């Protein structure tokens, strides 16, 4: 079970991921955080830096690069990255082990060459993050095969969602229960009744929060916003647009954005349903839109690579044989769906199936 707690600075710590990162610190492998945009990879890196400093690592021995910051906009390719890291440590690094942490590394052209050189030259222990599945597998596998570990980072599970929403809830419940146990004497029921009332109230609150979870999803950033549909859905839709246009349309040079947009809406509207490329192409044809099955397949692969969706393959039960192009599509974060097409209670079956799929995935 996930271990989520609050640190002294008030941040919610997702201990499962931090522990996975720490297990490989000072080992000769690249630590790769893989997850969709805004899932919390940057916060995990900052928390890891905090733990390194707590263990006595000088701040000068830690280089943190976030490619979403204009501060590092000049780092365009692998040579820029390598020279920047080399000069940083030559100019002021302290004695001892060095650490290089790079966020959204896919924004640096041929970055894998710099990472391979960091390893070869012993420049520092490397932790990277990225939000594109293809970049973080094929390119890494080519240059540093056997010298990296992938740590997938998922949106919040429901348990994590509760912790973000009510950081002290579990602590308060434990305190109430302990107080009831200590003050209850034989024949006295006031404390027990109080505990029962607390439990009933908590169950009611949990039901309400699960409804919020189904509607808003598990991206950590929503917990900095008012719990209002209009506000949260605008935020989620802005994230979705960034992913679609920056990570998919621009990167893959998609020419017909209108067909691509329709495909995204179709996939989001059919979460949990068995989907085939031919079925989608036939639907488009019924709407007087001409496109090919191959185009649909390519677009779905691009969307999957951006980590917006997961495909659950269907198998022939008798022969354990995978049936081609007959998958169920699930969303990495269900809230993004509602930012795009709105929330409908009539879709509850697919939404619940999506939540269960992601919970099982997060548990490994």
Where are these regions (language model features)?
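Hydrophobic anchor at the beta1->P-loop junction of P-loop NTPases
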Residues: 33
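Short glycine-rich substrate-engagement loop in P-loop NTPases that contacts/grips substrate
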Residues: 65-96
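Hydrophobic positions on the alpha1 helix immediately C-terminal to the Walker A/P-loop
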Residues: 44
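Interdomain motor-coupling "hinge/lid" segment immediately C-terminal to the ATP-binding subdomain
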Residues: 131-133, 138-274, 307
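Conserved lysine of the Walker
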Residues: 41
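Accessory nucleic acid-recognition modules appended to NTPase machines
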Residues: 61, 228-364
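Pre-Walker A adenine-sensing motif
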Residues: 8-25
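Conserved catalytic segments around the Walker B and adjacent sensor/switch elements
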Residues: 54-69
């Amino acid at each position: 079970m996930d271990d989520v707690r609050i640190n002294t600075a008030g941040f919610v710590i997702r201990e499962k991921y931090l522990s996975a990162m720490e297990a490989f610190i000072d080992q000769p492998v690249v630590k790769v955080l893989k997850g969709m945009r805004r899932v919390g990879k940057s916060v995990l890196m900052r928390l890891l830096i905090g733990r390194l400093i707590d263990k006595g690592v000088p701040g000068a021995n830690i280089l943190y690069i976030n490619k979403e910051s204009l501060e590092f906009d000049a780092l365009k390719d692998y040579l820029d990255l390598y020279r920047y890291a080399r000069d940083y440590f030559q100019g002021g690094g302290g004695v001892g082990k060095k650490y290089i942490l790079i966020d959204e590394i896919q924004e640096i052209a041929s970055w894998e060459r710099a990472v391979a050189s960091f390893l070869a030259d012993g420049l520092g222990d490397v932790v990277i993050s990225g939000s594109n599945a293809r970049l973080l597998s094929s390119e890494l596998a080519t240059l540093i095969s056997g010298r990296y570990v992938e740590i997938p980072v998922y949106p919040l599970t429901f348990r994590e969602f509760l912790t973000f929403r009510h950081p002290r809830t579990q602590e308060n419940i434990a305190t109430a229960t302990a107080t009831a146990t200590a003050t209850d004497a034989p024949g006295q029921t006031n404390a027990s009744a109080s505990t029962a009332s607390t439990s009933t109230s908590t169950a009611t609150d949990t039901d309400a929060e699960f409804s919020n979870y189904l509607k808003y999803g598990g991206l950590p950033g929503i917990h900095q916003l008012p719990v209002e549909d209009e506000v949260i859905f605008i935020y989620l839709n802005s994230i979705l647009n960034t992913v679609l246009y920056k990570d998919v349309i621009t990167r893959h040079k998609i020419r017909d954005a209108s067909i691509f947009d329709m495909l995204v809406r179709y996939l989001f509207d059919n979460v949990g349903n068995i989907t085939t490329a031919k079925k989608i192409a036939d639907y488009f044809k019924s709407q007087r839109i001409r496109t090919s099955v191959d185009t649909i397949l390519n677009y779905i692969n691009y969307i999957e690579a951006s980590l917006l969706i997961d495909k659950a393959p269907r198998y022939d039960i008798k022969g354990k044989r995978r049936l081609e192009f007959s998958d169920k599509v699930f969303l990495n974060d269900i809230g993004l769906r509602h930012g795009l097409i709105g929330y409908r209670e009539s879709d509850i079956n697919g939404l619940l199936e999506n939540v269960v799929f992601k919970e099982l995935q997060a548990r490994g």
